[in-house]
Swiss-Prot record:
PROSITE patterns: JMJC. It comes from the Eukaryota. Fe cation binds at residues 610, 612, 675. It comes from Drosophila mojavensis. One of its GO terms (biological process) is circadian behavior. It is an enzyme of class 1 (oxidoreductase). Its cofactor is Fe(2+). This is Bifunctional lysine-specific demethylase and histidyl-hydroxylase NO66. It is found in: Nucleus. GO terms for cellular component: nucleolus; nucleus.
Length: 888
């Protein structure tokens, strides 16, 4: 047992391997690994060989296929050549047979000078394969296999002259065949060179369809003529090879008998007639040879009414909501096709990142519950009457002016002159009724354009006595009617949104319409991106699809038909009444009043949810549009100074306002209000957005004011020019913000004291900063809309408008900025100004102070009468002054 246990213990005990055994084991495994490596290399080699063989088989297969295709192509070409040769032989045989028949029918009308041998050959139908025939006059003639000919000496003047007299086309690409890309040119009316390549009667359907005659409506001869038979100018009938003369006069084919008849009257001249060749496909359209010309049986001529009827069947039904009149069928452009119905908009999520109440409570603004003021609940005294015709409105307007002028007892002559001018407008003619012809011609553009009718003309006095600020206020009252401007600024301005609903669809139609847009695009050079934007908003993605170049009317309506929204920038440049609205309102707001027009097809949305940096007035002119307004996402977005990017729907909360604007309604919302709008499935939308008060906040004033205050303080106070302490970097800075020390507190207090002591602006500095904002307005503003009554009054004087001029300049000279001569485009030119001496400034200030009252030139606060007249003349020449009485 001990011996067994000893062996067991020896077997279980860990054995220490020797160096020799270790080397044996390593050698064994190395041989085994080498064997496996060789096997793997052999397998890879076999795989490469198999892949190479497979690739070689594929290459050979492709080569065999290419060779087969090449052989098939060669066989097809041979078959095509054989078919073409057969067709040529068949055509030549038909031509010979036709000549034989003609010779039998008209033996008496054969050409003079032809020998009896030639006539006998024609009667017997013998073919003369290109051999020369001796004529009786000693000349030779070659009989053709086909009827096409080449004339080099004008021997067909009797036929060709009639052809040219009855045809009217040019030699440019705008001729009747310009649709095929070819042109026709000739230099001699009596000499035509017809190509030797004839046409073939063997056309398949594809050829007939591809080579439809573009000249059918230009060349309509005798519709009762029998197909296959035609007559020349001498009354001789001859056969046609299947085409009709009514389709194209170049399809005439002259047979030998007709040639002889024509030559008998013009003299016996040698004529060379080339044989006919088979037609080839894919050749350019040859007007002389009628290549690619379909036969009459395959391409019958249709009248113009039939063509229009056929085109009308292919066109889609016009959109029921499209206000544009249908275009003629020849334009090949659908007026305003409706896009296919899009899926309904996704519902607004119930949750948002920041609730509207929190946002508005933090800023101190009132709740953003939108107020609605329906017109049927309030008196509508200021609403414009419904217009049945433009002449009635002009009559009413003129009568109002006449009545008001008659009430002014001190200006009876003035009223009579105005009455004459207005009667001239009333009849829509330009006959002069008094001696104001020169003044009226000078202001022809202003007087001929019909004015905006707001319905409140009776409430004002004579135009030349009105304050331009009050005129702007009246225009705002017309927009917000029945809400007054006082109520609007007290309850809604920069606080809440406001909707005015009125059941008057035509309330704003005088501002813009589809027809006005179409005329504007046709008559003016509007550019994409500069004047027109084409946008879409689908599946949460907003795209701008602006091409390059001019925005043509067909392109715009094409985009509209595809479901794109059209945004027209600065439309007031081209629409007089909209320009009058904007230029009048800018007098009240003392800032640029811009306008954009948005045209949206049914069931579409052109822009993603966003907010703007302007006070927005949305004027719904036509159609319907659903508007949804949301609270500003953050506190810093309330009354935002810059526009936002595009928001996703899930980033917005529930809308504060969700309603539909109808034609005649108006919606106001402050800057910073997130909004989006979408049209209904069967309703388009045309609306105007008036933008007001952009960059008109206290922040803008301080941005102009504080740099000048700091500059002046640095110049006058030594404390601001002293150096900073050496240890400031050790105690102040972002890295030291959490550490408190005596040095840090001392530096903070001293900096605050410097600001409070030296950076407080003076009144003069505030005045100068406001003048800078006024200067910016003079540059941006639209030129004033001059009424006919104002254009006559240009030695009491007053400023033409309250909001100009704006003083500015240097010490030695002052600049008076004005916007009378501004371009209609936004900031197109540099600001307009005139320079005056500092001693002349009191005269300008006096005119600004007494506005809108008139002031005698002699009362201007200047020392000498010459200086008064000089200043008044300079202002009047620039259009800044208006006289109390009109010039005669």
């Amino acid at each position: 047992m001990d011996r067994i246990s000893a062996y067991a213990a020896y077997g279980l005990a860990p054995k220490k391997t020797s160096k020799r055994s270790t080397m044996k084991i390593a050698k064994h495994f190395s041989k085994k690994n080498a064997k496996k490596t060789k096997e793997a290399m052999a397998a890879k080699k076999e795989a490469r060989k198999a892949a190479a063989k497979a690739a070689l088989r594929e290459v050979r297969k492709l080569e065999r296929k290419a060779a087969a295709d090449k052989a098939a192509k060669i066989a097809a070409d041979k078959a095509a050549d054989k078919a073409a040769a057969k067709a040529a032989a068949k055509a030549a045989k038909k031509a010979a047979k036709r000549e034989k028949n003609i010779a039998k029918k008209q033996p008496e009308k054969s050409a003079a000078g032809v020998t009896e041998n030639v006539q006998k050959q024609l009667e017997n139908g013998q073919e003369n394969n290109g051999t020369l025939i001796n004529l009786s006059n000693g000349k030779q003639h070659q009989k053709p296999k086909a009827a096409k000919m080449s004339s080099s000496n004008g021997s067909f003047s009797g036929i060709d002259s009639d052809f040219l007299n009855s045809s009217d086309f040019g030699s440019t690409e705008d001729s009747f065949m310009s649709g095929s890309g070819d042109s026709f040119d000739y230099s001699n009316n009596s000499d035509f060179d017809f190509d030797s390549d004839g046409d073939s009667n063997d056309f398949d359907d594809s050829d007939a369809a591809a080579s439809s005659c573009a000249s059918c409506e230009y060349f309509d001869m005798d519709s009762n003529m029998v197909v296959g038979q035609e007559s020349d100018t001498n009354g001789n009938s001859y056969m046609h090879n299947g085409t009709t003369q009514s389709e194209d006069q170049f399809t005439e084919e002259y047979t030998l008998s007709s040639i002889f008849n024509s030559t008998s009257s013009s003299g016996a001249n040698p004529i060379k007639v080339e044989p006919r060749k088979a037609a080839k496909r894919n050749e350019p359209f040859d007007l002389n040879n009628n290549k690619n010309k379909p036969t009459a049986a395959k391409q019958p001529k249709m009248s113009l009414k039939q063509e229009q009827a056929q085109v009308g069947k292919q066109r889609a039904d016009p959109a029921p909501s499209c206000p544009l009149p249908p275009r003629p069928s020849k334009t090949m452009i659908k007026s305003c096709p409706l896009p296919p119905k899009a899926p309904a908009a996704k519902p607004v999520p119930n949750k948002c990142r920041l609730s509207s109440r929190e946002s508005l409570t933090k800023t101190g603004a009132k709740s953003c519950r939108l107020s609605s003021a329906p017109a049927d609940k309030m008196a509508n005294k200021m609403a414009a009457p419904s217009r049945k015709s433009s002449s009635k409105n002009k009559n009413n307007d003129n009568n109002n002016i006449d009545t008001n002028n008659k009430k002014d007892a001190n200006n009876k002559k003035d009223a009579n002159n105005n009455k004459d001018i207005n009667n001239k407008k009333d009849a829509n003619n330009n006959k002069d009724t008094n001696n104001n012809k020169d003044n009226n011609n000078k202001n022809k553009l202003s007087s001929n354009v019909s004015q905006l009718v707001t319905g409140n003309e009776k409430q004002r006095g004579p135009v030349h006595l009105e304050n331009s600020i009050e005129e702007g206020k009246r225009m705002l009252n017309w927009l917000l009617n029945p809400i007054t401007s006082e109520t609007f600024f007290e309850q809604y301005w920069e606080r809440n949104a406001c909707q005015v609903k009125r059941k008057q669809p035509n309330y704003f139609t005088q501002l813009i319409s589809f027809q006005m847009i179409d005329e504007m695009l046709i008559e003016n050079q509007l550019e994409f991106t500069t004047n027109i934007d084409v946008t879409t908003y689908k599946k949460g993605v907003r795209q701008t699809l602006n091409p390059v170049g001019r925005a043509m009317s067909p392109a715009i309506w094409g985009y509209y038909g595809d479901g794109c929204s059209i945004r027209i920038l600065n439309p007031s440049t081209y629409l007089p009444k909209l320009r009058q609205l904007c230029s009048t309102m800018q007098e009240f707001f003392h800032c640029l009043v811009g306008a954009n027009v948005y045209l949206t097809p049914p069931n579409s949305q052109g822009f993603a949810p966003h907010y703007d940096d302007i006070e927005a007035f949305v004027i719904q002119v036509e159609g319907r549009k659903r508007w949804r307004l949301y609270a500003p996402p953050h506190q810093s977005d309330v009354l935002a100074r810059t526009s936002s990017g595009n928001y996703k729907q899930e980033e917005l909360g529930q809308p504060l306002f969700d309603a539909v604007l109808e034609a005649g309604d108006i919606l106001y919302f402050p800057r910073g209000t997130v909004h989006q709008a979408v049209t209904e499935p069967k309703q388009h939308s045309l609306h105007i957005t008036l933008s007001v008060y952009q960059q008109q906040a206290y922040a803008n004033l301080l941005e102009v004011l504080m740099p000048s205050v700091l500059e002046r303080a640095i110049k006058h106070h030594l404390s601001l020019r002293r150096g900073l302490p050496l240890h400031i970097w050790q105690h102040v800075g972002l890295a030291k913000g959490g550490q408190q020390s005596e040095q840090r507190d001392q530096l903070m207090n001293s900096t605050k004291q410097l600001v409070q002591r030296y950076l407080v602006p003076t009144e003069a500095q505030i005045d100068a900063a406001v003048d800078q904002l006024a200067k910016r307005f003079q540059h941006e503003a639209l030129p004033p809309y001059i009424k006919p009554e104002e254009s006559m009054r240009t030695t009491k004087v007053r400023l033409l408008r309250r909001q100009h001029p704006a003083p500015g300049g240097r010490r030695q000279q002052l600049r008076v900025y004005y916007y009378v001569d501004n371009a209609l485009e936004y900031c197109k030119n540099e600001p307009n100004y005139m320079e005056i001496q500092p001693t002349e400034a009191p005269a300008v200030e006096a005119l600004m102070t007494t506005y809108p009252a008139y002031l005698k030139v002699g009362k201007l606060p200047l020392r000498s009468a010459d200086r008064r007249i000089e200043v008044a003349t300079a202002l009047w020449e620039r259009g800044l002054l208006m006289t109390e009485k009109p010039f005669k």
